[in-house]
Amino acid sequence: MITVDFSNRTALVTGSSRGVGRATAELLARAGARVCVHYLNGEREAKEVVAGLPGAGHSILKADLSDPRAARILVDSAVTKLGKLDILVNNAGIFRRHPVDGSMAFDEWLATFQQTLNTNLVGPAAASFQAIQHMRQRGGGTIINIGSRGAYRGEEGQVGYGAAKAGLHSLSQSLAREVGKDNITVHAIAPGFIETAMARPHLQGAAGEAVRAQSPLNRVATVEEVARAVLYLASPEAKFTTGSVLDINGASYLH
């Protein structure tokens, strides 16, 4: 277990009512950070997360991150609640099939494609922009974007997802080069399949066995493994890894 002290540090974790976001919020709080838990639809779950976090001063906010203006307001609201923002974790995302095989009408396909890009790329970009304004004023900070293995190998039936995550990796690298002078570091994590509610339909039966067999470890990642990577990247020890994309895929895809 990584041992770090995040006392007097604050974090906004998007999509933290469940899955990787929840595990990340819990780990940051255990390390001493005050955490703002963001959700869109899981209000009950988000309240449960906040109630279970160790320490005091945590908060909860709702926002639709497919709207970049809402993403900007979310960051400002988190700063108001927390007093400052040291760590932004752009974790929220959607994974909705939109194949190009003609099974969807064009308008439906385009709407799903656009919503995927907005939620998985444009929203994090807007949140990062606003977080940088606050971090610059206070002398620095850290942004961590949760990307995907799909950015490298593509996602059949999910062209918007793969494109958005590839864009998120590139966004992270470009921001790292631009804001390093302001003592702001930017990182990305590229997990493969993770044992989450969103991935569960893909991990059942023979199809699930095939997914697990992609890794020589014959399993998928846990949410805690990804959360521990976030904790490391948010720590001072990881500062010189700014601009990197950390793979967490159990050697299921190497490049």
Model-derived segments and spans:
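Short C-terminal tail/terminal secondary-structure segment
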Residues: 2, 153, 231, 242-255
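Conserved glycine-rich cofactor-binding loop
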Residues: 10, 17-19
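The beta1-alpha1 cofactor-binding region of Rossmann-like NAD(H)/NADP(H)-dependent oxidoreductases
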Residues: 43, 62-74, 223-224
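Conserved mid-core segment of classical short-chain dehydrogenase/reductases
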Residues: 72, 94-114, 157-160, 200-203
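Catalytic Tyr-X3-Lys loop
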Residues: 106-125, 140, 144, 168, ...
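Active-site helix of classical SDR
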Residues: 128, 164, 172
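Alpha-helical segment proximal to the catalytic Tyr-Lys
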Residues: 133, 177-181, 239
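Residue(s) in the substrate-gating loop at a strand-loop-helix junction
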Residues: 148
